[in-house]
């Protein structure tokens, strides 16, 4: 058995670690803090997750220290945490200063309950809830739940309980990613179009532009198509469907924007976007497709074919933007490096593995790939 206490400074230390982790997890999962989930705002749910994770991290660390000092302590027996639900909710409410009813509502959302058993039958991806409701006023706190992003499990549960929640979660993502994109091009050098702009052909909408940035220094104009899809599951059919749709959508968007510009000209495009005080010089146009989590889909058998489009995932785009810095022609350089990576083909070599079980040898052919240098 394991028992310990902690000072306020120690609690604050693990709370700081948990806050840093949860903010990154929240962004990766695409859970905006301003949406409404059930009875509460998601920011309150996120806050409760921070405090639960801090308790998990503290327990893991203290169990590790105890095992080093007292070898007789059994880690597998000490790590699982059983607790009365009412006491845990009260503890977090006191620790956080939140209303106890608010904490209870957050627990109703993030806990895996006995009534969710059907969900486990159909779910094939990693699922590690922060809290397990045993159905008898007791809960289990599996500290292993911090090994992966817990919001993936929470979002999967939410969608199982209410399929309409997917729209609620997805609706703020475009604005969210647009604002993050514009933060990379701040200052007086750039003009940033604040909202989604539709390109019309007569009375019909041909396509739309999710984001646009104009470089006042060089006359370069960059148009962006923004995508934020979830890929935290292993259903191959769903993954291939998302990959196919992403590649098709980006190709169609590039084709329609190019078609509109060829028919109407760059001057009308800049007026449509509301860009002002354009320098008296030739304007260059660059098209970018940014997907928050994944962009190149050749691994699923699909690829984008548009020659005038550079695609990337969000971390890749940030990396190149930071590497390029205040270059003379920022968008030209960005477009070039992204196109080079987009067209780059890796030389892969299949790898096999052998596992010895008793007197038998199991050989898995082509289980992994290695990258040839």
Residue ranges and their predicted role:
Residues 1-373:
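Intrinsically disordered, low-complexity Ser/Thr/Pro/Gly-rich regulatory segments
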């Amino acid at each position: 058995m394991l028992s310990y206490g902690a000072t306020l400074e120690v609690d604050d230390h693990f709370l700081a670690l948990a806050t840093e982790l949860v903010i990154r997890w929240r962004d990766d999962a695409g859970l905006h803090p301003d949406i409404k989930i059930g009875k509460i705002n998601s920011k309150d749910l996120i806050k409760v997750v921070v405090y639960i994770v801090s308790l998990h991290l503290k327990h893991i660390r203290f169990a590790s220290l105890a095992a080093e000092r007292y070898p007789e302590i059994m880690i597998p027996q000490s790590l699982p945490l059983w607790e009365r639900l009412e006491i845990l909710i009260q503890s977090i409410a006191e620790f956080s200063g939140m209303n106890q009813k608010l904490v209870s509502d957050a627990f109703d959302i993030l806990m895996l309950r006995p009534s969710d058993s059907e969900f486990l039958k159909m779910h094939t991806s990693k699922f590690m809830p922060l809290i397990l409701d045993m159905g008898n006023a007791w809960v289990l706190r599996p500290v292993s739940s911090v090994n992966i992003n817990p919001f993936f499990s929470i979002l999967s549960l939410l969608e199982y309980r209410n399929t309409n929640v997917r729209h609620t979660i997805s609706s703020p993502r475009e604005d969210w990613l647009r604002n993050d994109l514009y933060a990379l091009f701040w200052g007086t050098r750039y003009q940033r179009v604040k909202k989604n702009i539709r390109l019309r052909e007569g009375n019909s909408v041909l396509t739309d532009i999710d984001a646009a940035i104009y470089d006042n220094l060089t006359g370069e104009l960059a148009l962006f198509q923004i995508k934020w899809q979830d890929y935290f599951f292993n259903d191959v059919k769903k993954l291939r469907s998302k990959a196919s749709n992403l590649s098709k959508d980006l190709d169609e968007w590039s084709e329609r924007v190019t078609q509109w510009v060829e028919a109407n000209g760059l001057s009308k495009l800049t007026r449509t976007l509301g860009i002002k005080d354009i320098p008296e010089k030739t304007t260059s146009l660059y098209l970018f497709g940014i997907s928050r989590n994944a962009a190149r889909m050749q691994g699923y058998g699909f690829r984008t074919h548009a020659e005038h489009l550079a695609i990337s995932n969000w971390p890749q785009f940030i990396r190149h933007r930071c590497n390029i810095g205040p270059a003379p022609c920022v968008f030209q350089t960005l477009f070039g490096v992204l196109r080079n990576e987009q067209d780059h083909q890796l030389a892969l070599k299949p790898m096999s593995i052998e596992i010895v079980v008793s007197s038998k040898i199991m050989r898995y052919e082509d289980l992994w790939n290695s990258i040839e240098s």
